[in-house]
C-alpha cells in the first residue's frame, strides 16, 4: 500500500504523486513495485535490500539515488517468540523523489504522520524527513522499553513467589529483545554521522535537529543498558 504525502504544516495525504512529495510504501504489493520501478525508476536492488529482515542501518548509492536504511521497533504478534523486534525501513531519495519502504506494519509511521499534523511540523527536505524518522524511532524504542520494564517487574514478582521455567524463559526473551534494541539504536546513531557527511555541503543540514536526534537516541541507548543490567542481575539471582 502506498500513500502520497505533502507537507503543509504537517503531512497531508493527496490523491496523486508530484515531485518532492513523500511516497510512503508499507507492505508493498505488485502494483507498488511497478509504480516504484517503472514510474519512478527506483533501483530494484534497493527494494530487495530493504526486504532483507536482517539488513543493518547503512547508506548506499546508485547513480543519483541515495538509499538510507534504518531499523525501527515494532510490537510482535502473540504468536511470535519475542514480544518486540526491529525491522528495516528504507528511505530512497534523489533530487525530486522521496520514497520510504517498509515491509512490515508498525505503529511508528502512522504515529509520525499524525504527529506532524498535530504539531504543524514543517519538514523542509529529504534529510529533515530522515532525521525526524530517526528521532521517532528513538521515541518508540523508549515507549516499548517502558512496557518491557513492566514485564520485567511482573516476572520478578512471579519468581519471588515460585521459580518457574516459564518466568525464566520470559526474562530470557526480554533480554534477547534488549540486545536487538541495543544494536538497532547504535546502528541508527552511526547513520547520523554518515548523513552529516553526505549532506555537509548542502543547505539541508539542520544542526539543531541533529542535536535533538542524538540526545533522544542516547536516552534510548542508556535506557536499554539500564534495563539490561537490571535483567542480568535478576536472572543471576535466580
Language-model features, listed with the residues they occupy:
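Helix-boundary and N-terminal cytosolic regulatory elements
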Residues: 1-121, 151, 187, 191-204
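A short, structure-level motif marking secondary-structure boundaries and short turns
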Residues: 17-19, 129, 166-167
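A short, ordered amphipathic alpha-helix with a cationic face
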Residues: 22-23, 120, 143-146, 181-182
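Conserved residues at beta->alpha junctions
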Residues: 26-27, 103, 135, 172-175
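Membrane-associated alpha-helical segments
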Residues: 96, 137, 153-156, 160-238
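Short, charge-rich amphipathic alpha-helices with coiled-coil/heptad character
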Residues: 118-128, 156-162
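Well-ordered alpha/beta subsegment
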Residues: 124-152
Amino acid at each position: 500500500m502506498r500513500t502520497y504525502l505533502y507537507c503543509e504544516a504537517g503531512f497531508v495525504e493527496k490523491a496523486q504523486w508530484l515531485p518532492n512529495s513523500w511516497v510512503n510504501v508499507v507492505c508493498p504489493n505488485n502494483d507498488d513495485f511497478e509504480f516504484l520501478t517503472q514510474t519512478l525508476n527506483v533501483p530494484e536492488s534497493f527494494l530487495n535490500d530493504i526486504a532483507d529482515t536482517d539488513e543493518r542501518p547503512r547508506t548506499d548509492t546508485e547513480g543519483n539515488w541515495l538509499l538510507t536504511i534504518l531499523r525501527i521497533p515494532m510490537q510482535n504478534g502473540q504468536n511470535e517468540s519475542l514480544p518486540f523486534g526491529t525491522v528495516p525501513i528504507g528511505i530512497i531519495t534523489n533530487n525530486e523523489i522521496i520514497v520510504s519502504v517498509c515491509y512490515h506494519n508498525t505503529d511508528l509511521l502512522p504515529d509520525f504522520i499524525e504527529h506532524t499534523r498535530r504539531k504543524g511540523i514543517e519538514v523542509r527536505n529529504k534529510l529533515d524527513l530522515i532525521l525526524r524518522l530517526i528521532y521517532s524511532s528513538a521515541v518508540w524504542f523508549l515507549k516499548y522499553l517502558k512496557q518491557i520494564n513492566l514485564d520485567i517487574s511482573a516476572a520478578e514478582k512471579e519468581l519471588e513467589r515460585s521459580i518457574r521455567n516459564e518466568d525464566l524463559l520470559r526474562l530470557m526473551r526480554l533480554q534477547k529483545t534488549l540486545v536487538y534494541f541495543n544494536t538497532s539504536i547504535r546502528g541508527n546513531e552511526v547513520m547520523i554521522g554518515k548523513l552529516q557527511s553526505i549532506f555537509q555541503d548542502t543547505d539541508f543540514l539542520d544542526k539543531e535537529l541533529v542535536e535533538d536526534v542524538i540526545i533522544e537516541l542516547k536516552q534510548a541507548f542508556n535506557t536499554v543498558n539500564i534495563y539490561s543490567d537490571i535483567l542480568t542481575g535478576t536472572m543471576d539471582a535466580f
